[in-house]
């Protein structure tokens, strides 16, 4: 702990006591914020873990279907079949506020062309390729949700660390320093008051002797 360099006056004492009250209130608010951030962060981590398992399984299934399609189709026809996407996809993003953290909300904006989701005819393609396209179509939304949650986790973790540093600074530096300085000024003021009383008593005794 380090005492603050201030003049030991009653005005300084009053000002420091106000700062101490403010620091304690700020510490409580930040600690409450930190606890709530941690609660929401843990929920996001659980959601992220569950969704990641789902996405990895869906992607693995899609890849297996694609391998089967590759085995049953000529490379030329396969490349030609998937070279021209059937729909244009953009990502629309807005922000939502969670405990002063702006986290992303994302969704796909699809510009679909007429007809089916398959970007090819069915004469020279296989059922395995159809299965691959269907599975990839289904996994897209989960992939975007996973990206949204993982970015939110990163932003929340940054805010938790920032809040933790502020809580620790108040708890282990600012508040103890203020408390120590307030205590020191009180002691000095008490000493000054006792010294003043002693001088006054001596003056009174001298006046009484002269009377």
Curated annotation (Swiss-Prot):
Any one Pfam family match given in the protein's UniProt record, by short name: ATP-synt_D
* GO BP term, example: proton motive force-driven plasma membrane ATP synthesis
Per UniProt, the keywords (alphabetical) are: ATP synthesis, Hydrogen ion transport, Ion transport, Transport
Q: Which InterPro entries match?
A: V_ATPase_D
According to the UniProt record, one GO cellular component term is: proton-transporting V-type ATPase complex
Single GO MF descriptor: proton-transporting ATP synthase activity, rotational mechanism
Enumerate the transmembrane spans. Answer: none
Q: Which family does this protein fall into?
A: Belongs to the V-ATPase D subunit family.
- What is the role of the protein in this entry? Produces ATP from ADP in the presence of a proton gradient across the membrane.
The protein in question is named V-type ATP synthase subunit D
Instruction: State the species of origin.
Output: Fusobacterium nucleatum subsp. nucleatum (strain ATCC 25586 / DSM 15643 / BCRC 10681 / CIP 101130 / JCM 8532 / KCTC 2640 / LMG 13131 / VPI 4355)
> Which gene specifies this protein's sequence?
atpD
């Amino acid at each position: 702990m380090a005492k603050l360099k201030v003049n030991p006056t009653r005005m300084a004492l009053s000002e420091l006591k106000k700062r101490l009250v403010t620091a304690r209130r700020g510490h409580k608010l930040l600690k409450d914020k930190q606890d709530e951030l941690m609660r929401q962060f843990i929920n996001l981590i659980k959601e992220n873990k569950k969704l990641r398992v789902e996405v990895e399984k869906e992607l693995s299934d899609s890849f297996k279907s694609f391998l089967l399609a590759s085995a049953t189709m000529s490379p030329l026809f396969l490349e030609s079949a998937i070279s021209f996407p059937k729909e244009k996809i953009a990502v629309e993003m807005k922000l939502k506020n969670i405990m002063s953290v702006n986290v992303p909300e994302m969704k796909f904006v699809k510009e679909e062309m007429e007809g089916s989701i398959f970007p090819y005819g069915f004469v020279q393609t296989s059922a395995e390729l159809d299965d691959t396209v269907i599975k990839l179509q289904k996994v897209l939304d989960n992939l975007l949700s996973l990206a949204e949650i993982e970015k939110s986790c990163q932003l929340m973790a940054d805010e938790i660390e920032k809040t933790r540093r502020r809580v620790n600074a108040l708890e282990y530096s600012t508040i103890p320093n203020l408390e120590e300085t307030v205590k020191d000024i009180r002691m000095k003021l008490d000493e000054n008051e006792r010294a003043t009383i002693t001088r006054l008593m001596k003056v009174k005794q001298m006046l009484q002797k002269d009377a």
